[in-house]
Amino acid sequence: MPNWLKKQMQKAFLEKDNYQIKLLNQCWYFYRKKHCS
């Protein structure tokens, strides 16, 4: 996981920002799919 994404994730979890967490999860999912396939 890239550093910027980790930071965003931690921030979202600290603020209990569910919308942001969902968004970042999708972002990470697509990122992984793109780089792994």
Curated annotation (Swiss-Prot):
One GO BP annotation of this record: sporulation resulting in formation of a cellular spore
Predominant subcellular localization, coarse grouping: other
Keywords: Sporulation
GO cellular component, one term: intracellular immature spore
Keyword tRNA processing among record annotations: no
Effect of inactivating the gene: Deletion mutants produce heat-resistant spores more quickly than wild-type cells, but are sensitive to lysozyme.
Induction: Expressed during sporulation and is regulated by the mother cell-specific transcription factors sigma E and SpoIIID.
Entry-linked InterPro entries: CmpA
Subcellular location: Forespore
Membrane-spanning ranges: none
More about this protein: Overexpression causes defects in cortex maintenance and cell lysis.
Subunit structure: Can form a complex with SpoIVA and ClpX.
Functional description taken from the UniProt entry: Ensures proper spore envelope assembly. Represses premature cortex assembly until coat assembly successfully initiates. Also participates in a quality-control pathway that selectively removes defective sporulating cells through regulated cell death. Acts as an adaptator that delivers SpoIVA to the ClpXP proteolytic machinery for degradation, specifically in cells that improperly assemble the spore envelope.
Name of this protein: Cortex morphogenetic protein A
The species this protein was found in: Bacillus subtilis (strain 168)
Underlying gene: cmpA
